[in-house]
Amino acid sequence: MMETYGLFEKLGNARPDLDLAMQKMAEECPEFRLISADVARAGMPEFIKKYPKQYYNTGIAEMAAMDLAAGLAIEGFKPWIYGMSVFNTLRGGEGIRTNMCYQGANVKIIGCNILFPYHCATDPCTCHSSVQVLS
């Protein structure tokens, strides 16, 4: 088991604050869109209830989330993606490179569970791989 030095207990759960921040952005900017790959229901339930027309859930399809966000950005929307860090980068990496970076698409990506040690996996499911892929 990975030693966390009590980090999770010290940090607490930032999801409610993130939910409020996303609601504020949606309220202030009609072009704001939130896209998730099947995790926002747990992390941002109030946003989804309050702004259902500004929320897209691609299911367990990070590449689709990246492609959707890039397309929305190119059309003038302000998309943010919320998903597990490792899957955003490793499963969505080609979409980030080809459809966001090459196109100059203004997309923001929020990675959650960065330090969470997946018990069924090893290093490929922690933040180290995400950082390596994007660097």
Task: Provide a role label for each language-model segment.
Residues M1-S135:
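Thiamine diphosphate
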